[in-house]
Amino acid sequence: MTIQCKVKSIQPLACNTYQILLHPESPVPFKAGQYLMVVMGEKDKRPFSIASSPCRHEGELELHIGAAEHNAYALEVVEAMQAALETDGHIEIDAPHGDAWVQEESERPLLLIAGGTGFSYVRSILDHCVAQNKTNPIYLYWGARDNCQLYAKEELVEIADKFANVHFVPVVEEAPADWQGKVGNVLQAVSEDFESLENYDIYIAGRFEMAGAAREQFTQNKKAKSERMFADAYAFI
């Protein structure tokens, strides 16, 4: 479904990463974990995970877009959003999309794994589960190059402190001397912490290679069930 949206705000979150709030002309029914397509042209639609959960923000849609200078694909979208904001114009989106939404009926513990701005996908799921007062154990592993890119770290620490069933583990490749989290690869960190993933619902967002490696490693080495692993990437790989 194609919908016109006003761009409500654009805020920098971290190095080259922006939070964008969209206000659609009509409500967009979506499930936590789905994505939208920003329509840049008739045959040019670009996918971004919806970072907000369906039960919040009074119909607003939140995006987190990583737009480094070398990433023209995302940078052009941010520039189009900026132009719409400055001229009080519209952005066109096509939504909702994706089959990797949260399995609300499941009572299994959740393992949420994000690489970089893949965090927006797991944030929607976490936010939704917390808002719905779900009591399933939730483990969120967020990997990034450095601490600067973990732009929601303080928010996640607060959520984990407030809700006994939520556990947050930050993972960076380059750690400062006073670093309190894990160092290295996010999939390696998960492998070190879990003997078995047999009983988990696993949600993954990041590069396609990471999602593919997770499916291979976790099903072969950690007894994960491939049918209980969810990622947008799995529709393509």
Swiss-Prot record:
One of its GO terms (biological process) is bioluminescence. Involved in bioluminescence. It is a good supplier of reduced flavin mononucleotide (FMNH2) to the bioluminescence reaction. Preferably uses riboflavin as an electron acceptor when NADPH is used as an electron donor. Keywords: FAD, Flavoprotein, Luminescence, Oxidoreductase. Transmembrane segments: none annotated. The keyword Hydrolase does not apply. Its EC number is 1.5.1.-. It comes from Vibrio harveyi (Beneckea harveyi). SUPFAM superfamilies: Ferredoxin reductase-like, C-terminal NADP-linked domain, Riboflavin synthase domain-like. InterPro entries: FAD-bd_FR_type (IPR017927), FNR_nucleotide-bd (IPR039261), MRET (IPR050415), OxRdtase_FAD/NAD-bd (IPR001433), Riboflavin_synthase-like_b-brl (IPR017938). Pfam families: NAD_binding_1. GO terms for molecular function: oxidoreductase activity. Residues 2-103 form the FAD-binding FR-type domain. Pyridine binds at residues 115-119. Gene3D superfamilies: Nucleotide-binding domain of ferredoxin-NADP reductase (FNR) module, Translation factors. This is NAD(P)H-flavin reductase. Belongs to the Fre/LuxG FAD/NAD(P) flavoprotein oxidoreductase family. CDD domains: flavin_oxioreductase.
